[in-house]
């Protein structure tokens, strides 16, 4: 059985990147929450 995590920079950026987050209302909330919390890294 193969492992579930098969790293890919492209898929990582497309799914969890900043622009992907900003594309939806829920994603915008995530970014806002991470900003409020003072996270150094907002997205992948």
Swiss-Prot record:
Which Pfam families does the annotation name?
Ribosomal_L34
Q: Name one GO molecular function term.
A: structural constituent of ribosome
Q: Which UniProt keywords apply?
A: Ribonucleoprotein, Ribosomal protein
Spans through the membrane = none
Cross-referenced PROSITE patterns, in alphabetical order? RIBOSOMAL_L34
Q: Which GO terms describe its cellular component?
A: ribonucleoprotein complex; ribosome
**A biological process term (GO) from this entry:** translation
What superkingdom does the record give?
Bacteria
Q: Does the keyword Transcription apply?
A: no
Q: Does the keyword Disulfide bond apply?
A: no
What InterPro entries does the annotation carry?
Ribosomal_bL34 (IPR000271), Ribosomal_bL34_CS (IPR020939)
Check the record and name the NCBIfam families matching this protein.
rpmH_bact (TIGR01030)
Q: Which family does it belong to?
A: Belongs to the bacterial ribosomal protein bL34 family.
HAMAP family associated with the record: Ribosomal_bL34
Give the protein name, as stated in the record.
Large ribosomal subunit protein bL34
- Species of the source: Methylocella silvestris (strain DSM 15510 / CIP 108128 / LMG 27833 / NCIMB 13906 / BL2)
